[in-house]
Amino acid sequence: MTLLNISGLSHHYAHGGFNGKHQHQAVLNNVSLTLKSGETVALLGRSGCGKSTLARLLVGLESPAQGNISWRGEPLAKLNRAQRKAFRRDIQMVFQDSISAVNPRKTVREILREPMRHLLSLKKSEQLARASEMLKAVDLDDSVLDKRPPQLSGGQLQRVCLARALAVEPKLLILDEAVSNLDLVLQAGVIRLLKKLQQQFGTACLFITHDLRLVERFCQRVMVMDNGQIVETQVVGEKLTFSSDAGRVLQNAVLPAFPVRRRTTEKV
């Protein structure tokens, strides 16, 4: 089943010029893609290529300058109030900047309960039980429930944001560099959790990343973005080889898993 369909998406930002006139900076140019239920897809690209802007458009935080975004066959622009509430529940996003994504005055308990209070019909006791369950799933415990964001490490806060997104059992989870910043042990645990959710609920995942290792370990398909355009789409297999210049640059930037001894012909 197709969850998300994007066709001919373009976007720009206006900014003031030296002459006082507004100028438009193109960020996305004619982007089209589809995401299906249970699918794991990566959007790979260097910083500043338009990945995060695309993510903001997908979840409805901004409206595109041109093009169409449809969720389960319905254009986002035409969703009624009930459909929009269901959409906010079904598609969740975890941002790279976890500090800006939460209210620093709220406790972790309040942060986790917030989407459940607005998007689910659960009693308070059920919300608290699910909050504890989600914390455990991201390798945290109830000891953080009464803490506030400034009292947590960056990795802990990132996992709280992930737990918050998972609490409403979304159909699509968008992770904007949200897993790349975790250490490898935590990253592996989160990936196991996401795989379990896919099997249980058919949750689709869109990884917005520049981390090629993450793509190779978890994703079924990868799209390469460069200068606001998707320049290549590949199925992830045993050996991932890119044909675009942007894809090859990212692939060549990955360090080998083990040090490679440099051969020399010089005699000592």
From Swiss-Prot:
Topology in membrane: Peripheral membrane protein
ABC transporter domain segment(s): 4-252
Alphabetic keyword roster: ATP-binding, Cell inner membrane, Cell membrane, Ion transport, Membrane, Nickel, Nickel transport, Nucleotide-binding, Translocase, Transport
Positions annotated to bind ATP: 45-52
GO MF: ABC-type nickel transporter activity; ATP binding; ATP hydrolysis activity; nickel cation binding
Record flagged with keyword Cell membrane: yes
Pfam families: ABC_tran (PF00005)
InterPro entries assigned to the protein according to its UniProt record, in alphabetical order: AAA+_ATPase, ABC_transp_ATP-bind, ABC_transporter-like_ATP-bd, ABC_transporter-like_CS, Nickel_NikE, P-loop_NTPase
Cellular localization per UniProt: Cell inner membrane
GO-annotated cellular components: ATP-binding cassette (ABC) transporter complex, substrate-binding subunit-containing; membrane
Any single biological process term in GO: nickel cation import across plasma membrane
Primary site of residence: membrane
EC numbers, comma separated: 7.2.2.11
Reaction it catalyzes: Ni(2+)(out) + ATP + H2O = Ni(2+)(in) + ADP + phosphate + H(+)
Family: Belongs to the ABC transporter superfamily. Nickel importer (TC 3.A.1.5.3) family.
PANTHER family according to UniProt: D,D-DIPEPTIDE TRANSPORT ATP-BINDING PROTEIN DDPF-RELATED (PTHR43776:SF7), TRANSPORT ATP-BINDING PROTEIN (PTHR43776)
Quaternary structure, from the entry: The complex is composed of two ATP-binding proteins (NikD and NikE), two transmembrane proteins (NikB and NikC) and a solute-binding protein (NikA).
Functional summary from the UniProt entry: Part of the ABC transporter complex NikABCDE involved in nickel import. Responsible for energy coupling to the transport system.
UniProt-recorded name of the protein: Nickel import ATP-binding protein NikE
Species per Swiss-Prot/TrEMBL record: Escherichia coli (strain K12)
Organismal lineage: Bacteria, Pseudomonadati, Pseudomonadota, Gammaproteobacteria, Enterobacterales
Gene: nikE
